[in-house]
Design a protein with these regions (language model features):
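Right-hand nucleic-acid polymerase module
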Residues: 1-127, 135-247
Length: 247
C-alpha cells in the first residue's frame, strides 16, 4: 500500500499554520456506508482535528486587541440544564451586539466578532461560558469601554422591572496569542484545548467570522520503511510520527 505525508498550510490572519499527517491510497477509495461506531482512537483524532480547525478560526478572526471572556454563575442563577446555559450565551451575544450598536454605531458594530461557548464537564459539572470577542477599529479608550461592556452584560433582567442583575462573575482578559497557539508553556493545546477539554460544549458565533485560507497541499512520498526525503532532523521526526499514525 502506497503511503505519503501531506503538508497543509493555512493563512490565519497574521499567522500561518501547518498540518502534517499521513495519507494512504486507501483513503482515496470510494467511501461506503458506516456500519459500526468509530473506535476510541478515531474519536480522539476527530476531536483533535476539530480543535485544530477551531484554533485556526480563532487565529483568523481575533488578535491581541481582542478579549478572552469567561462567565460563571452565582448558585442562585445557575441554569437547570445545559440548554438553558446555551440560551444565556445567546442572550449575552444579543446584548453585546445591541450595546455596541448604541455606543459605537452600526457601521463599526459590523466589525464586532464573537465566538462563545457554553460548556460543562459531565452532567454534574458547573455550567459556564468561555469565548472570544473583538470589535475592530476601536481606539485604546474605546477598547477599555468595550471590555467593561463585556463584563457588565453577563446579566439578566429582573422579571417585571427594567432593572438587571448579574448572573455571576464575568472577566474579559486581553487575548494572549501565545496561549491560543499553546506555546506559553501552560499546556500544548492552549486556550482552545482548554475549551475542548469540556465534555459538553456548544458554540454561539456571529455570522461575520472568516475562515482560514487553505493553501495548496504538498505531498511527500516515503520510501520503505518510511524514510522521509527531507533531511531536517526535527522535521524528519515529525514526519515519521505522522507516518506511524501519531497525532
Amino acid at each position: 500500500m502506497k503511503s505519503w505525508i501531506r503538508e497543509k498550510k493555512y493563512e490565519c490572519g497574521e499567522y500561518r499554520t501547518v498540518g502534517i499527517y499521513a495519507v494512504t491510497d486507501q483513503e482515496h477509495r470510494q467511501r461506503g456506508r458506516k456500519h459500526k461506531e468509530s473506535s476510541r482512537g478515531q474519536k480522539a483524532r476527530n476531536k483533535n482535528a476539530s480543535m485544530r480547525r477551531y484554533q485556526r478560526k480563532v487565529l483568523a478572526n481575533f488578535d491581541k486587541d481582542g478579549f478572552y471572556v469567561t462567565g460563571t454563575y452565582e448558585d442562585a442563577y445557575r441554569p437547570e440544564s445545559f440548554e438553558d446555559c446555551v440560551q444565556d450565551v445567546r442572550n449575552y451575544e444579543r446584548r453585546v451586539k445591541a450595546a455596541v450598536i448604541r455606543r459605537f454605531g452600526e457601521q463599526r458594530a459590523r466589525r464586532l466578532k464573537l465566538s462563545l461557548h457554553a460548556v460543562r464537564n459531565g452532567e454534574k459539572g458547573k455550567l459556564h461560558m468561555h469565548g472570544f470577542a473583538e470589535c475592530k477599529g476601536l481606539t485604546t479608550a474605546e477598547r477599555r469601554e468595550f471590555r467593561a461592556m463585556l463584563e457588565e452584560l453577563w446579566r439578566r433582567r429582573v422579571p417585571g422591572t427594567g432593572e438587571y442583575e448579574p448572573l455571576g462573575t464575568c472577566n474579559a482578559d486581553r487575548i494572549d496569542v501565545k496561549k491560543i497557539l499553546g506555546i506559553d508553556g501552560d499546556g500544548k493545546n492552549g486556550t482552545v484545548g482548554y475549551i475542548y477539554g469540556h465534555s459538553e460544549r456548544r458554540c454561539v458565533e456571529t455570522r461575520n467570522l472568516t475562515l482560514p485560507e487553505e493553501l495548496r497541499a504538498a505531498d511527500v512520498e516515503f520510501m520503505h520503511p518510511f524514510l522521509p526525503l527531507y533531511h531536517d532532523k526535527r522535521l524528519t521526526e515529525r514526519l515519521a510520527e505522522a507516518a506511524a499514525g501519531v497525532q
